[in-house]
A protein has these predicted regions:
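Glycine-rich phosphate-binding loop of ATP-dependent small-molecule kinases
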Residues: 1-511
Length: 511
C-alpha cells in the first residue's frame, strides 16, 4: 500500500484557508448528528514517528464539541494492563453511543512497534491479527464507525523533523532513542507497517493512508476522510432504521401473538432431541458423602488458588442454568475457603443505562480478571443468546452473530493464558417447581423468587431450545461447557468443585 503513495502532494495556503472553515463546520454538524442517532465513532491515528499525529488530532478535535469526544494516548502497557488480555485496555476505552473516541496510537502497537522491538513474537502475529480483525468486526457490526488513518512520511522527511525537534530544548524530549533506531531501520519498520495494513484492511474498518509531508494537505485529507465516513454511516443508519421499522410493522401484521414471534426465534436448527434432555438427573450423594468430598475439594481449591496467584494464571468461570438450579449455592461452596482478595463474583443483572450505551460485551470485558486472579460470573455474556433472544431484546441478526463474537472473546482470553470454564446448572421442570414452592413458603427465601422467574418457567421449551443451540455452538476445547446434573444439590456442588480444581491442576502441571 505504502509504495504507491505520492508523498509530494501539497495544498496551497490560500486553498487551505478557503476550504478549512467549511469542513470544520461540517464536521461539527456531523458530530451532533451522530450524537442524535446514537452512533459511536472511533478514530484511530497510526503512522511513522514525527508524521504529525498529535498535531492533526489537535486540529481535528478543534471543531468538535469537547463534551462529545475523548482522546486516548496509547503508550507501552502499564503493569495493570500487562496483567490482562491484550485487547482489554482497548475494550474498556470503546465509546458509548453518540460519543467519539480518538486514539493516538492503538491496538496496532502490538503488531508494529512491539513487533519491531521484539516484544511481540513472530509466531503470535497470526493470532494477533485475527484478534484485531474480530475486535473491529464486532464493534462495526454493533454499530460503531471505525476510521483508521495512517500518516505516512519517508525516511528523509522523518530525519529532518527529528533534527528540528531536537534543536529546541522544549521539544527534545519528543524524540526518543527508539524513534532514532526506527529511523535508521526505516525500511524494515516500513515493511512491518505494510504487513499490518495489508492484514487489517477490511470492508468494515478500512485504512486510509494520509500523505503527511505537507501538513495542510494532510489536515484536509483527514477532515474529508472523517466527514465522508460519518456521512456514509449516518446514511446507512437512517436506511437501517427505516428498514427495521418497516420489518417490525410487517411482523406485527403477520404474527397475531408475540409467542409466535418468539417461537420463530427459538427454532432449533441442530437436532430434534435436546442435549439437555439426555442428562441423567438421578445422580446424587448422601449427606455424609457430600461432607467428606466437600471438605477435601475446598481445601484443594484453597491450595490451588494460591498456586494460580504465584504462577499468574487467570481463571474465568461462568454460571448459567435454570432459575433455582443452584448457581448461588455452587458459587458459595466453590469460594468458601479461597482468599477473597484473589477472586471476584460478578452477578449479572439487566444492563444499566451506561452499559446499554456500549457494545454488549463491554461490561464483561471490564470485569475480566488480571493474571493470577479468578472472575466468577453468576449469569454471563450468554444472556445475548438466551434471554435477549427469547424476549426480543435484540434482533435475530444480533443474537445469531453473537455466537462467533463470544467464541472470539473467549479465544482472546484463552490466548492470554486464562482457564475458562462454563457451567450449565441443569434441573428438570418438576424440581424447579418444587424449589419455587419451597421459596414461596419460606419467608427467608421468598426474596429469591420473582415474577420474571415465573414468566420464564412458562417458556421452558423455548429456553431449552436456546440453551441447546448455545452449548452446541460455543463449547470449545479452550472454553468448554459442563452440564451439571443439579436435581441433587450435593452432587451439583461437588461436580462444580471437582471440575474447577481438575482444570486448574491440569493447567498448573502444563506450566
Amino acid at each position: 500500500m505504502l509504495e504507491k503513495i505520492d508523498l509530494n502532494k501539497k495544498m496551497s495556503k490560500q486553498e487551505y484557508s478557503e476550504s478549512l472553515p467549511k469542513i470544520e463546520a461540517e464536521l461539527g454538524r456531523l458530530q451532533r448528528e451522530c450524537k442524535d442517532l446514537d452512533i459511536p465513532v472511533m478514530i484511530v491515528f497510526e503512522g511513522f514517528g514525527a508524521s504529525g499525529k498529535g498535531l492533526q488530532i489537535g486540529k481535528l478535535i478543534h471543531s468538535m464539541d469537547p463534551r462529545g469526544f475523548e482522546v486516548h494516548t496509547i503508550k507501552n502497557e502499564t503493569e495493570e494492563e500487562r496483567m490482562h488480555p491484550f485487547l482489554w485496555r482497548f475494550w474498556i476505552k470503546t465509546p458509548e453511543k453518540g460519543k467519539i473516541a480518538v486514539f493516538d496510537g492503538s491496538w496496532y502497537r502490538k503488531v508494529w512497534v512491539d513487533r519491531f522491538e521484539k516484544r511481540t513474537r513472530e509466531k503470535e502475529l497470526k493470532d494477533d491479527f485475527a484478534s484485531i480483525n474480530a475486535f473491529e468486526q464486532q464493534l462495526s457490526e454493533g454499530g460503531t464507525l471505525i476510521i483508521k488513518l495512517f500518516l505516512d512520511i519517508d525516511q528523509d522527511e522523518q530525519e529532518k523533523r527529528f533534527k528540528k525537534l531536537e534543536k529546541k530544548k522544549e521539544t527534545q524530549w519528543r524524540v526518543t532513542q527508539g524513534d532514532k533506531e526506527r529511523n535508521v531501520k526505516y525500511d524494515e519498520y516500513a515493511l512491518m507497517a505494510e504487513e499490518m495494513l495489508f492484514c487489517t484492511d477490511t470492508d468494515y474498518a478500512p485504512w486510509t493512508i494520509i500523505e503527511a509531508t505537507d501538513r495542510r494537505f494532510a489536515t484536509t485529507k483527514i477532515y474529508m476522510t472523517v466527514i465522508q465516513a460519518m456521512q456514509e454511516q449516518i446514511r446507512r443508519q437512517k436506511e437501517n432504521s427505516a428498514l427495521l421499522e418497516k420489518t417490525n410493522k410487517i411482523v406485527e401484521e403477520v404474527c397475531e401473538e408475540k409467542e409466535v414471534q418468539i417461537a420463530q426465534y427459538a427454532e432449533n436448527r441442530f437436532s430434534e432431541v435436546s442435549i439437555l434432555s439426555k442428562t441423567d438427573l438421578s445422580c446424587s450423594y448422601t449427606k455424609e458423602e457430600y461432607k467428606q468430598k466437600l471438605d477435601k475439594l475446598q481445601r484443594k481449591a484453597e491450595r490451588l488458588h494460591g498456586e494460580l496467584y504465584r504462577k499468574r494464571i487467570p481463571v474465568v468461570i461462568g454460571f448459567e442454568g435454570w432459575d433455582a438450579a443452584g448457581k448461588g449455592g455452587a458459587i458459595k461452596r466453590l469460594t468458601e475457603k479461597m482468599d477473597p482478595r484473589g477472586y471476584v463474583v460478578n452477578p449479572t443483572a439487566s444492563p444499566n443505562e451506561v452499559e446499554k450505551a456500549h457494545h454488549y460485551l463491554w461490561r464483561f470485558w471490564k470485569a475480566m480478571p488480571k493474571d493470577g486472579h479468578v472472575a466468577i460470573f453468576d449469569r454471563t455474556w450468554y444472556g445475548r443468546v438466551m434471554v435477549e433472544r427469547i424476549e426480543g431484546f435484540c434482533t435475530e441478526e444480533e443474537w445469531k452473530r453473537a455466537y462467533k463474537e463470544i467464541n472470539d472473546m473467549e479465544k482472546d482470553l484463552a490466548n492470554a493464558g486464562a482457564v475458562i470454564l462454563k457451567f450449565w446448572m441443569h434441573i428438570d421442570k418438576e424440581e424447579q417447581k418444587r424449589r419455587f414452592c419451597e421459596r414461596m413458603e419460606n419467608p427467608e427465601k421468598r426474596w429469591k423468587i420473582t415474577e420474571e422467574d415465573l414468566r420464564n418457567r412458562e417458556k421452558w421449551d423455548l429456553y431449552e431450545h436456546a440453551a441447546d443451540e448455545m452449548i452446541m455452538r460455543t463449547s470449545t476445547a479452550y472454553a468448554p461447557w459442563v452440564i451439571v446434573e443439579g436435581n441433587d444439590k450435593y452432587y451439583a456442588r461437588i461436580k462444580v468443585l471437582k471440575t474447577v480444581t481438575d482444570a486448574i491442576e491440569k493447567r498448573l502441571k502444563e506450566r
